[in-house]
Amino acid sequence: MHALGRHIIAELYGCDKEVLNNRELIEKIMVESALKAGAEVREVAFHKFSPQGVSGVVVISESHLTIHTWPELGYAAVDVFTCGERVDPWQACNYITEMLKASHMTTTEVKRGLFEQPVKVANL
């Protein structure tokens, strides 16, 4: 089977609580992770919750990256979905894990868009 893309679902534990509650820093980390993976950033939207927590999305030409943080638990839920062969979602995921100072993570990789024959998609 041939996949259109790879979707990394990451559970990050033991993260730096101050980082998890800093909207500007979370946004910077997410955008930098996309760029380090070789993605082309299109749109960025992040929100700081009261009293704590940040959620955000980085829309890339190749799909998206998302994060939802729970500073009180030292936990972040991260998705990195990339289409095509040019961008490596693991580079982004590993960078995010390092920058959030996670003590450990669990991940699942899902192949998205499975076809029996290779599919040619424009710009990927």
From Swiss-Prot:
Superkingdom, taxonomy of origin: Bacteria
Modified residues (Pyruvic acid (Ser)): 63
Biological process, per Gene Ontology: spermidine biosynthetic process
Site (Cleavage (non-hydrolytic)): 62-63
Pathway recorded for this protein: Amine and polyamine biosynthesis; S-adenosylmethioninamine biosynthesis; S-adenosylmethioninamine from S-adenosyl-L-methionine: step 1/1
One of the record's GO molecular function terms: adenosylmethionine decarboxylase activity
Keyword DNA-binding recorded: no
Main enzyme class: lyase
Catalytic activity: S-adenosyl-L-methionine + H(+) = S-adenosyl 3-(methylsulfanyl)propylamine + CO2
Coiled-coil intervals: none
Named cofactor requirement(s): pyruvate
Post-translational modification: Is synthesized initially as an inactive proenzyme. Formation of the active enzyme involves a self-maturation process in which the active site pyruvoyl group is generated from an internal serine residue via an autocatalytic post-translational modification. Two non-identical subunits are generated from the proenzyme in this reaction, and the pyruvate is formed at the N-terminus of the alpha chain, which is derived from the carboxyl end of the proenzyme.
Family matches, as Gene3D superfamilies: 3.30.160.750, S-adenosylmethionine decarboxylase domain (3.30.360.110)
Catalytic residues of the enzyme: 63, 68, 83
Cofactor binding, per record: Binds 1 pyruvoyl group covalently per subunit.
Keywords carried by this UniProt record: Autocatalytic cleavage, Decarboxylase, Lyase, Polyamine biosynthesis, Pyruvate, S-adenosyl-L-methionine, Schiff base, Spermidine biosynthesis, Zymogen
Subunit structure of this chain's protein: Heterotetramer of two alpha and two beta chains arranged as a dimer of alpha/beta heterodimers.
Function: Catalyzes the decarboxylation of S-adenosylmethionine to S-adenosylmethioninamine (dcAdoMet), the propylamine donor required for the synthesis of the polyamines spermine and spermidine from the diamine putrescine.
PANTHER family: S-ADENOSYLMETHIONINE DECARBOXYLASE PROENZYME
Listed name of the protein: S-adenosylmethionine decarboxylase proenzyme
Taxonomic path: Bacteria, Bacillati, Bacillota, Bacillota incertae sedis, Caldicellulosiruptorales
Gene from which this protein is expressed: speH
